[in-house]
Every structure is written in structure tokens, then in C-alpha cells.
Amino acid sequence: MEAKVEEKEPEPVENAGPDAPVRLTPMMEQYIEIKAANVDSLLFYRMGDFYELFFDDAVAASAALGITLTKRGKHLGEDIPMCGVPVHAADDYLQKLIAKGYRVAVCEQVEDPAEAKKRGSKSVVKRDVIRLVTPGTLTEEKLLDPAQANFLMAMGRTRGDGALALAWIDISTGTFRVAETTPDRLFADIMRVDPRELVVADSAFHDEELRPVFDLIGKAVTPQPATLFDSAAAQTRIQHYFNVATLDGFGQFSRPELSAISGAIAYIEKTQISERPPLMRPEREHEGGTLFIDPATRASLELARTMSGNRDGSLLKAIDRTVTGGGARLLAERLTAPLTSPKEIALRLDSVSWCLSEQTLCEALRLELKGVPDMPRALSRLAVGRGGPRDLGALACGFEAAGGIASLLDGALLPDELAAAREAIEKMPAGFAAHLDRALADELPLLKRDGGFVREGYNSELDEMRALRDQSRRVIAGLQADYIEETGIKSLKIKHNNVLGYFIEVTANNSGAMTDTDEAKSRFIHRQTMANAMRFTTTELAELESKIANAADRALSIELAIFEELTAEAVAHADSIRAAASALSVFDVSTALAVLAEERGYCRPHVDDSLSFNIVAGRHPVVEQALRRQAANPFVANDCDLSPQRDGGDGAIWLLTGPNMGGKSTFLRQNALIAILAQMGSFVPAGSAHIGVVDRLFSRVGASDDLARGRSTFMVEMVETAAILNQAGEHSLVILDEIGRGTATFDGLSIAWAAVEYLHEKNRCRALFATHFHEMTALSEKLERLSNVTMRVKEWDNDVIFLHEVAKGAADRSYGVQVARLAGLPEAVVNRARDVLHQLEAGETSGKADRLIDDLPLFSVMLQQEKPKPQIQAKDSELANAVAAISPDELTPREALDLIYKLKELAGKA
């Protein structure tokens, strides 16, 4: 965005009388006219070196940005609010506004003030909106997270049958995908992609069946005219955008898919105005190709973000060892959309295995990868006119790193996925890479208007202009020496003043050499005669003067022309550049997952089409990493075998009982995460893993309410459980934690009981079901594919030690009172709870409720004095000190025996 001189604002017409309303200036009239066409956006109105905002826009922006609200002129008798942001810092302010959910229309001066004056002294410089900045259409580096895709999504729908499809585009990288969906899958499919913005037709936005989904998504939904989604006009729109005569090479798309594609492209055309970001051809995703994970499961498993919205603490953060922005985005994409094809999963696992077997080579690859900039995003900025010299430099650096990687891989025997990636890297535009290397300077400015980004020696005229601009004195001195040699006048000087400019001056006595012959007169043109000197010029000197005066402007003009030439060449090679960049991301992800596997001791899973689910010594990847970081006790690994009994497994459902704080929820989550990691193509935190492909993953773990929609925690739990029971199939994996809590005990037990029976008999899926309803363990006698397992604990002197080990069998207690004590509840409350528990367990509540109250007065604990803690006697202290001084690992067997006798002696004295 280059600065332009602000034109002088024409004055408003004089009032006709004292009561006449104040007229707006022509500039403000222009603002109101442009704003009327962009009512849903804040209008950044260019005035000189600032973007100004007026009226309600100014009030909203000043509050959102924390900038001063001032005023300028009046309208209808009221001051016009105004605020502004400097053009050079506009990206910083746009970032804040977009984050707060605003859309911004950027209005630029589209003519020079001098041109406006030619139309009359009161003419206003022409302005127009050149771009709409929305969350889903960002390209600027400052506005984007390098590790996260920035998708714009459009929903298409056909009239009549109401069939649905989604198309999503990241204009910062050119990624373009499309897939069909259904109303019951719509929210899950949207959340899998996690778009920054969702555009839908007005009619669909107000559809009663779909509106609840849009309400959940909130501000990210942007309704648009239904004409943008016309599937009948989609073919023409696609052909026009991609500049092709036919769509034969694009594949076949359904009508709802065409509607979605049309809506996405139309919205890009609408927001980018005259620019056309280069996009890949839309790639169709087939239903069932990826693991279906519903939104509740995605949130509770904290795949990409924690429940509080942070990246730290998520599975993605725990496994990310990538070193490039493209690699980080590819890793996130694979994690959020695991595959369901064992063959495709094996291809990815082969890549990781190869990297583990070639660690020295892979270390060298990662060093090269660290030098790879974000080539796709640099290319997109260049294509839409928002790029700078450093974006060209990013391409050059990427080509250099790609060349280094290709050299490292030369002759290597690669698995299929990496072999294809190497081939794409080798097809990068080597000629263009060499061109960039010749053209670009080593140090590049941020903005092209600053110049200095073209290498010396690349363009002879540019070198000359720079020499004139930077070394004019040396050039003049050289010309002066030439004239001295030509005339033989050693006192000849070339001087400069504001009247004559550059001129040649000689003494009157020496002037004859310049005037005596016709040849000399034609060569040296007389300018001025002084008392003791004469002044001349030459055609050469006049041209040099003109060149010096215009050298800076000409130098910048040449550089800008070279920039446009290089940009056009980059866009022409967009497909091969993107292919090479994608290939580099594949190498980044594969080597990163190998580093993770080596670092954490992960194993290669065996994934097939069976119903097996046998995890040996599995671990929770996030919790394990947190424990290591805290230097705490190592994570306790556990087995999980949900394989069919015919395959030697324990059955399809594990009913897990055990204490609070025992690790049930962690165990449930870790097995779901292991399945996700395996199917995304990663090694897994286990001793071994055999997983039959999971087609749908459901979880109900953790408690949350939805007060905004009038749903209690229990209601949310029931809705999510209903979705699981209605959708899970034989190849699904279900994890359920404490279903039935939040209501009366027998109600909850009944619901949990019936749910397990339904999972076993109807869904017939693999499932982990954790519960505190110990009565349910009797189901193992009735349901042949159900096994009881429990979290082991050890009791010691009224305390409970959580072993975090899963073992066969059933728990008969939940140790809630002990956990309450550990949590710091007052001792009197803990004691009272223990007494009540004993009464309840003795079955003495079958009578009236007041019997328990009479026997154990509820509030009597408040009147009781806390028992004083026993004082440690001297002898007790001596015994305690002796025990505390023991270093068990340093004792020999003989020393240990002697110590036992000593401790027994001290205990006897006590």
C-alpha cells in the first residue's frame, strides 16, 4: 500500500440561511456513498497516509482498537465521530479487528490528486473499495498463524432434495477441496475442517433444520445472496475463474458440490474485487475416506486445542516436531482427519519407518528443511498484489533448500510416499530458481517501494541509474576529466547552480579553445558570459543532468518493473511451486514423526480391516509428556484388548470400574488417541498395537453444560449418548465415562445399564465404558462380549494409593471419601461422610430418611471441636528420624537386617 498525497478537501457550499442544515463536504459525500455499498463492513477510507473511519464505524473501531475517537465536521447538526490508523501499520489493526469478528472494506485512492484537479478545483480524488478483509480471506503474513490453515468454507444445497455439500479454500496456500455431507453430519464435517469463515445462502441460513448448526458456529457464519450458490451457473463460474474452456479435467461433481464450489469462488471474487488468488483445482473427498469424529469427541479428546481453546496441552502440541509452516499445517490436517484405508495408512507408516532407519540422513534433511520458508503463502501474496521482495526471496530460499534436499536424496531407495515427494521436488522450476538467484539482492527490503532488492549487475540501465543517483559527484568528476583532456584547459570546472543547473566554466583567457572553431562551437554551447569567465554546456552534460535528476525515480521504476516480471513468472509456475512445497511438507511430517517415535519410544502399529483392538503397554501421549516435563513419576502403561474373542481377545466391551483419581478417564482417552495416531500414519505410544480400522470414533468423557441453549450437564450427556447409540456401528470405537451421573442413583444406573446392553447387542462396536455403578459388573455374566476390568489401588492406614494399573476384575468401592480427604475437605466433614457411608453400605436407609438424620445429626459436625492432633513424643520423633534417615537403595542386605533390629528396638521403647 503506497502512500499518496492527500488532496485538499473541497469546501462545502455556503448555507442558504441561518436555519439551513450544514451540507456535507464532497469528500464526506463520497464516503457515505461508498459506505452505503458496504454496510456490513468497517470502511477503511484512505486519506493520505491514514485510513480514516467515520460515524458508527469510528465508534466501533476506536473501542475495539483502543485508539482515540475524535470528530470531523457535522452531519444533521451532530459532530461526525472519526478515528484513523496509519497505512504503514494497517496490518496490525486489521489483525485485531478480524480477531474481534469484524469485516473491513479497504478503500483506496485510485487516481492521483493532480488528475482530480484537471476535472476542476472542487473535484474529489476517486476512491474505491479494492478488497474486503474477512476472517476466511486473509493472505498477509501478520494476519496468519504459520502452523494453522485459514479456510474459507461454503455450504451448497440443492433445491428439492436439500442435498448438502461443503467446499473449503485456503487462499493463502491455494488449497481447494469439496465433499458431500448430510444434515446429521454437517456440524461434524464443518468442525473437522475448522474454517475461519462459513458462507451460506440466505435461504439456508434461515432454514429451521440447519439454523441450530449455524447458531453453534456463531460469528463465523456469513449469509450471502442465494444467486452465488446457483449450481446451474457454477460451471461457467469455474471455467471463468480457472480460465479453461471445459471442466473435463476437473472430474465429476454432484449438484450440491457444484453449488458449494460456486459459492466459495463467488465469495472470493466478491472480497478480492479485481484480484484472483491462484487456486488448485477442487479436489473431491469421498465419504468414508477419513475417520468420522463428532464435535463433542473432537473437543473432549483435545486434538488440536484444549477445552479452554489453548494449543498447549493438546495432542497436536505434544506430537509436533515439524520445522516448517507447511509441515505443521499438514500434521494438523492429518491429525484432525485420520484415514480409514489400511493401504494408505501403511504408506505413511512406511515413510516414518524409513526415516527411523536412516537417522543420519534424516538429520541432514531436517537441517535443510529448517531453511524452507512458507512458499505457498508467499506465492499467494505475490499473486494478489500484496507481496513484497521478501516473498520473492522466500521462493528463492525454498528453491535452494529443495535443491539441497534433492541432492541428499539422490540415489536413496525411498518408500512410495517419499519417492513421489522427491519426484515433485525434482520438478521444481529450476530455470526460475536460477532467475531469482541472479535477480535478487542478498539483503531484501520489506516493501518494494523502498527499492534496493535487485542485485547489482542484473540490469545495466538500473546499475547506471543507481550510479547516477548514488555517485553523481564521481560521475561529474569523470566527465570533467574527459573535458579537460579534450580541451587541454586544466582549470576547466563543471559546476552547478539552481538557475543554470550543471555547466562548464572556464576563465575568459581559456575560452578560445571552446569558441574558435565551428566544431568547438557546436560541441560546447555557450550559456553565460561573466566578467572573468565563460560558461558552457554540452548535449552530453544536459542529458547527464536530466538523468541525475530523474535517476532515483527511474531506478525505482526499473526495479518495480523487474518485480512485476518476477511475480508474473512465479504465478506462471504456481502449480510446480506448490507441488514442490507440498512435497517438502511431506518430508517434514515424516521426519518429525520419526523424531517423535525415537524420542518417546513409540512403536509402529499394525492397522488392518479386522475388528481387532489390542494395545500392549499403551500410554497417554499428552499426560506422559507432561509427567516427563515435571520430572514426576513415570507414566504407568496399560494394556487394552477389545478384539473379538475368536481372535483371542477379551471381548468387544470393557466395563471399567475403580476409584476416583484412579486414572479411568486417562485410560479411556489414551486408547482413543492411540487409534487416531495410528490412522493418521504415526507411530503410537505403546509396546505394540494391532488396530482394526475405526470408521467412527465417539466419546462421552467429562462433564459440561450448555446453559445458553437451556441444557443441563445431564441433558448434554444424554443428547451426546443418544447420538452415539444411534450412529455407532461394528467398526466404531466408543468410549463412555460415567454415563448416568447427574440424576437420581437408580435412574442413572438404569440408563447406564441399558446403554451397555444396547452397545453390546445392537451397535456391536468396540467400547470402553467406565462407571461407578458397581452393580453393572454383573452384566459380564449375561453379555458374552463384555469383560470387567478395574483400576488397582492399595489401601494403607485409611489412605488409598492409586496404582493407575488396569487389571481384570471388578471394584466394589470408589474411595470417594478418601479422595475428598486428599482434596482438603475439613476433617469433620470427612469423618461425617465416612459415618454416613457406613450406614448406607449397611443398608439402613430402607426406612424413613429421618432415621439417618436422628442417628447421625447432619449439622452436629459444626458443633464438634476438631480433635487436637496428637503431639509427637520425643521417642516417637527418634523413631521417625531414624526412618527418615534411611536410604534404601544404598543398604546392603546385612545393613538392612541390622536396621530392622534397631527400628524394632526403638518401637519397643516408644
Swiss-Prot record:
One matching Pfam family: MutS_V
Recorded GO CC terms: cytosol
Single GO term (MF): damaged DNA binding
SMART domains per record: MUTSac (SM00534), MUTSd (SM00533)
Domain of life: Bacteria
Coiled-coil annotated residue ranges, if any: none
InterPro entries xref list: DNA_mismatch_repair_MutS, DNA_mismatch_repair_MutS-lik_N, DNA_mismatch_repair_MutS/MSH, DNA_mismatch_repair_MutS_C, DNA_mismatch_repair_MutS_clamp, DNA_mismatch_repair_MutS_core, DNA_mismatch_repair_MutS_N, DNA_mismatch_repair_MutS_sf
Region feature (Disordered): 1-21
Presence of keyword DNA-binding: yes
Start-end of Basic and acidic residues biased regions: 1-11
Signal sequence bounds: none
Family per record: Belongs to the DNA mismatch repair MutS family.
Protein name (Swiss-Prot/TrEMBL): DNA mismatch repair protein MutS
Gene behind this protein: mutS
